[in-house]
């Protein structure tokens, strides 16, 4: 089993932890998240971005991780970036906790997400269906209040 973690921090009150686990190279990755400081009762875009660079805040993380050059989509769409994880839903206190499984994410090999950045966005991801100019690139998910580089863990 391969495990990785990202500690989310940023220029805002949003913070949290995201863990990634993969039992085998061909198996899905289990993503567990606990993120606080968001607006209450909201959906927020949640993506893996290309670079593990946060030198200029979360902007330095670059675009969504997209090694297959696809359009943006939802996590269950066939046409999507590898890094498209959809939205997390916050509770009445602005906390998003949950678990998801994703078959495109990998923790080993050429398209590994280790060393890249996971970002929580300030708006809802329209999953590529919003009709906005940015829908097919970013899901029009807005700013990047918090992010963290994904690193291997024991």
UniProtKB/Swiss-Prot annotation:
Chain positions recorded as Zn(2+) binding sites: 64, 72, 81, 84
Cofactor note as given: Binds 1 copper ion per subunit. Binds 1 zinc ion per subunit.
GO molecular function, one term: superoxide dismutase activity
Subcellular location as annotated: Cytoplasm
Swiss-Prot/TrEMBL keywords: Antioxidant, Copper, Cytoplasm, Disulfide bond, Metal-binding, Oxidoreductase, Zinc
Binding site for substrate: 144
EC nos: 1.15.1.1
Any one GO CC term of the record: cytoplasm
Similarity-based family: Belongs to the Cu-Zn superoxide dismutase family.
Reported function: Destroys radicals which are normally produced within the cells and which are toxic to biological systems.
Name by which UniProt lists this protein: Superoxide dismutase [Cu-Zn]
